[in-house]
Amino acid sequence: PTRGNDCGMFHYLTEAGIPFSRLHDVGGYFGGGRFVDIPNLFPDPDADPADPASYRFGFTDLLVTELMKSGTEPFFRLGVTIENEWAVYAARIWPPRDSLAWAKICEGVIRHYTEGWADGFHYPIRYWEIWNEPDNVPDPMENPMWRGSAEQFFELYATASTYLKEKFPHLKIGGYGSCGFYGVTGGNVPTYAATSPRFDYFRTFFDDFLAYVKAHNCPLDFFSWHSY
């Protein structure tokens, strides 16, 4: 939406036949403070995930409803938006204190939009993505998306994906919105796709993630990455 809650341009989605819209960086410059992100939907991390009163769905309800009216299915990212001011203060990009509690919050979000829970909806939203770009920077203290180690993210993914897939076996649970594979060589990758320590980390993170998922038998219905 523009100017906070204006969805007047969404008709272009219909006219262009856009099938999906990924819900990330929503509602203003790099995300705003109202839409989609788990801290926006569930502002008090100590509240009860089973209590509808713990959630603030209003802004995201508007967004999702207008997308569905436009014939565009949300590709729902569960997590937070980028914090480009991390050097001043990193607010929401730390690993959740309790991975299972976080997964239960995500369960409430999914039930609200697909099962009508908490005065919600029965929308056919199929894809639920855990986090975004936890591999953004090798040093966690300089990472604008994930202020934790790779292992901490793998544990969060394992806990959340396993829990959510048990609750919603018919939905697609995956992740993690990788930065991409700029450092890959060979095949059809152009020679100017030079590597760097950061790009190498993208690949290392990916390899270690897949190894962890396999070792722990975690659900991975899809893997998402970016092609900047």
Predicted regions mapped to residue ranges:
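Mature N-terminal, pre-catalytic/accessory segment of carbohydrate-active enzymes
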Residues: P1-P19, H24
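Substrate-binding cleft and catalytic face of glycoside hydrolase catalytic domains
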Residues: A16-Y228
